[in-house]
UniProtKB/Swiss-Prot annotation:
It comes from Oryza sativa subsp. japonica (Rice). This is Abscisic acid 8'-hydroxylase 2. Heme binds at C441. Pathway: Plant hormone degradation; abscisic acid degradation. GO terms for biological process: abscisic acid catabolic process. The keyword Iron applies. Its EC number is 1.14.14.137. Its main location: membrane. PANTHER family: ABSCISIC ACID 8'-HYDROXYLASE 2, CYTOCHROME P450 26.
């Protein structure tokens, strides 16, 4: 009965709210395709190509109900088992081609990336901002990507270690005390704080920080809702909060310009780089980025920095908790650094984070196992041939990262959590936790730094206990343990810390 009620609920939700949002988008895809079938030898050649195998399901709805009524990973895995590494389906009214091989992922994301553009529903672009870099291709995207990469390069991250460490320390201190809390929610707060310090440096006042946090949380709650602008709906509230974010960011930018004098003002952080960045206009003139462009990219970076990283951090805590021997080995590695820093009296350094070999392997294996980004969306900008199959113009194309990460051909015994597999680098294009190509996540090193610092602080100064069942997974929209992994956290006494440190290191060296 519970399953029946769940199925009825999902069916009603999809038919009444989700599907209509995508029908207009995908109707235009079919129209463009009809126009593009004008003929000539090229079209006759493409007509002879086969579409990939697969099922398109029911008209308009496609196989959306099958996807949403079961674990999406089971859905995609069963499709691959039946049809192979390239197959078609119809989701939310959109025809899609799924690709589950490293070669196909590289084809779409790297070698032939010009034939596939990033695609997002218009409601998502409105929420984040149409000028955010990951909605674009071409010169504008490359210019902004270079700027973001410069702000997140090793030299820049080296200076951020104390700020990241302080954010981690504050998050764990607020959580400790033995009360039950959602790990995911605690990690979201941490990731937001790290995102803020990355964008604004140490220059953001408490008022602006809290205003950003409050309004961003409203935007986040409405991001995945049906785009209904009726007053009182989550989406309408999110749109209003997004407008307030724009006003807050304009105020921050204006204050910086007033302090910084001419030009773009700013500073050495990401916001300063955005304020100094110049954009080539249509007439070839050079102009500073507008306040709208700056705001869109700040919100975009906050969005990219929070939920995905928080999800991985949550899984790391679970995997370590469920692997006691591995946890002891990680403690030994981190306690050696802790003792070298005189029991935490000296600050953690960038060089020390580079020496955390086992912890880094744990992070990589957590990224593989959890596969937070299970797939990515692209859209074919032309009819494309791949391995004898036709990918029609306008169809959605989805490289399935999770299927690749869990393929025993590339990772032996893929359902086993085994960090030692990363003692050897994986084969090219088989490990894609941050995507690949020009649209790969530019903040991957920042995310890994946050994870390394969190593990260091956690295992050297705290102990934790998971409360309740943690094997079920929920999608919100990224996979996390059910309920966000409820857990208790306790601070260890300083004397106990040093005793454990000496004992752990001695045992590890025996």
């Amino acid at each position: 009965m519970a399953f029946l009620l769940f199925f009825v609920f999902v069916t009603a939700a999809v038919l009444c709210f989700v599907v209509p949002a995508f029908l207009l988008l995908c109707t235009s895809v079919q129209r463009r395709r009809d126009v593009g079938q004008g003929g000539g030898r090229d079209w006759q050649k493409k007509k002879k190509l086969r579409l990939p195998p697969g099922s398109m399901g029911w008209p308009y709805v496609g196989e959306t109900l099958q996807l949403y009524s079961q674990d999406p990973n089971v859905f995609f895995a069963s499709k691959q088992k039946r049809y192979g590494e390239i197959f078609k389906t119809n989701l939310l009214g959109c025809p899609c081609v799924m690709l589950a091989s490293p070669e196909a992922a590289r084809f779409v994301l790297v070698s032939q990336a010009r034939l596939f553009k990033p695609t997002y529903p218009p409601s998502k672009e409105r929420m984040i901002g149409p000028s955010a870099l990951f909605f674009h291709q071409g010169e504008y995207h490359l210019r902004l990507r270079r700027l973001v990469q410069a702000a997140l390069a090793p030299d820049s991250l080296r200076a951020l270690v104390p700020d990241v460490d302080a954010a981690v320390a504050a998050t764990l201190a607020a959580w400790s005390g033995g009360h039950v809390a959602s790990t995911f929610h605690a990690m979201k707060k941490l990731s937001f704080d790290v995102g803020v310090v990355t964008i604004f440096g140490g220059r953001l006042g408490r008022r602006h920080r809290e205003e950003l946090r409050t309004n961003y949380s409203v935007v986040e709650r409405g991001y995945n809702c049906f785009p209904n602008r009726f007053p009182g709906t989550l989406y309408h509230k999110a749109i209003q909060a997004r407008k307030r974010l724009r006003a807050i960011l304009s105020e921050i930018v204006a204050e910086r310009r007033a302090r910084g004098g001419g030009g773009g003002g700013g500073g050495d952080d990401l916001l300063g780089g955005l304020m100094r960045s110049r954009d080539d206009g249509t007439a070839g003139a050079v102009a500073l980025l507008t306040d709208d462009q700056i705001a869109d990219n700040v919100v975009g970076v906050l969005f990219a920095a929070q939920d995905t990283t928080a999800s991985v951090l949550t899984w790391i805590l679970k995997y370590l908790h469920d692997s006691p021997k591995l946890l002891e080995a990680v403690k030994a590695e981190q306690m050696a650094i802790y003792v070298a820093n005189e029991g935490g009296k000296r600050p953690l350094t960038w060089t020390q984070t580079r020496s955390m070999t086992l912890t880094h392997q744990v992070i990589l294996e957590s990224l593989r196992m959890a596969s937070i980004i299970s797939f990515t969306f692209r859209e074919a900008v032309a009819d494309v041939e791949y391995k004898g199959f036709l990918i029609p113009k306008g169809w959605k194309v989805m490289p399935l990262f999770r299927n690749i990460h869990h393929n025993p051909d590339y990772f032996q015994d893929p359902q086993k959590f085994d960090p030692s597999r990363f003692k050897v680098a994986p084969r090219p294009s088989t490990f894609l936790p941050f995507g690949s190509g020009v649209h790969a996540c530019p903040g991957n090193e920042l995310a890994k730094l946050e994870m390394l610092v969190l593990v260091h602080r956690l295992v050297t100064a705290y102990r934790w206990e998971i409360v309740g069942a943690s094997d079920e997974v929920e999608y919100s929209p990224f996979p996390v343990p059910r309920g966000g992994l409820n857990a208790k956290l306790w601070k260890q006494e300083a004397e106990e810390d040093m005793y454990m440190a000496m004992g752990t290191i001695t045992a590890a060296g025996a």
